[in-house]
Amino acid sequence: MPFCGFLSANVINLNQMRACAAVHRPQRVNEEERSFIVKIIRTKDYADMSRKAANIISAQVIMKPDCVLGLATGGTPVGTYEKLVERYNEGDLDFSEVTSVNLDEYRGLPKEHPESYWSFMHRNLFDHVNIDPAHINLPDGTNMDAEAECKRYDAVIRSVGGVDLQLLGIGHDGHIGFNEPHDAFDLGTHCVDLAQETIEANKRFFDGNEDLVPKQAYTMGIRTIMQARKVLMVVNGAGKAEIVKKAFFGPVTPEVPASILQLHPDFILVGDEEALSLI
């Protein structure tokens, strides 16, 4: 289902949203006008969250063996990947026809660097299942020609027919992928300067030294994420409760990038009790 091109860098226009009502649900303006539904699956803890998210991804792979999975990195989806590997080892999943496209990659890190997202994905999923290496796609962090790399990656995503299911986490400031607050909603793949809060959050992966954290990254844009046929977000911990409430029960605004998911026709939020404690 195509994503209507009415998103600007600054505001969401309610009349324009209503013009696309068959595809997208309008933003929450007030209780009387509210007509969208964010599908929420509440889980008791991180393990339960990971299991239920893996259930959704497993169903996608089983029902469409040659599906395109949009994959995410960070701490939250690790448990989901562990469950997928378990199911592969039990003979329940076959990744041989699956194509993957990752959300993002640090700019300037060689893929063999232990903290590159290429390494993360191989360590947590790809090395443990039968996905064809030729079907694995990530932005090339070593390509310092940002314009060329962004065009290349957008072309890759188009060439595989777009994303069937996009897995996401959410940052404390509402970023998804490396789409930081105030980034335009209508961007495809682009190069971003990482926000200080993002650098702070990611320094734990670099021995706690923020000087080692790359300061730029390539990321799928909001436009590309919204074009996915299904979007699945995983969220856990009390530290995410405030942003979950703000993103999905507040206004749709580039100040909170994840808020745009309120308008996606097939968005599922899977969270533990702590993360969903304020909604």
Regions found by a protein language model. Give the residues of each.
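Ligand-binding beta-strand-loop-alpha-helix segment within the catalytic cores
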Residues: 93-166
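N-terminal glycine-/serine-/threonine-rich phosphate-binding loop
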Residues: 36-69
